[in-house]
Amino acid sequence: MKKNVAKTYYVYILECANGAYYTGITTDIERRFTEHKTKNKGAKYTSAFGVKNLMAVWKTKKCDNPKSLASKLEYRIKALERKDKEEIIANKKAFKIIFMNNFEFNSFIRFF
């Protein structure tokens, strides 16, 4: 009998060539970053503006629905002002401070 094993999801922030930040989710960060860089399977935004750097990555800890949790974090990061995005990129503790009232976000660890 096949076990239902929850996948690990990653939430990431890329810096685009135009200086903007792009946030996304994936189960394979290396594959997805390569897709963004080569523009063949990247998002429309990164295909249009190019990608410079991988700035930060968060990995889901074990939980019942990691995809849903990663999607929620992606949404919350996209809603942040640029200065807050820069803070969570530069300072690992800033993530906990900014999201301290969201207990479910304790299910992430900084991966990169």
Locate the predicted segments by residue.
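Short arginine-rich
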Residues: 40, 75-90
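Basic, flexible Lys/Arg- and Gly-enriched helix-loop patches that mediate nucleic-acid binding at interfaces
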Residues: 44
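Charge-biased low-complexity segments
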Residues: 47-53, 80, 87
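GIY-YIG nuclease catalytic motif and its immediate N-terminal context
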Residues: 1-41, 50-74, 92-112
